[in-house]
Amino acid sequence: MKMLDYVQRAHVRMGENLERSSELVALLVDIFQSGSFNALRIVASGSSRHAADCARDYLQDALQMQVSVVTPEAFVDFEHTYPRHALNIAVSQSGYSTNTIAALDYMRTHDMAAVA
């Protein structure tokens, strides 16, 4: 498929996702509500990071808490310590981003709250 094929199909996929929105985010909402998180940290790169950057201000306003967006490399090297008590969300458009998977492995190894 070419990029134009994805662009032409995007409105259909968006409609499908909106119809299933409660189902698609149920686990994330359950985890978020069951914890005592004071921040949200989104770990992403490339187009996933761009999408997270676009959503950041809205999420921060809606949740009334700090929301940060960091690359997987920065997360593993130094961005994992602050803010404490953050829910970490690892985002990968394809699900195969090796750097994002490495960050998720770091989260799991260090018993950090994480959703992917």
Q: Where does each model-flagged region fall?
A:
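Glycine-rich phosphate-binding loops that contact phosphosugars or nucleotide phosphates
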Residues: 35-116
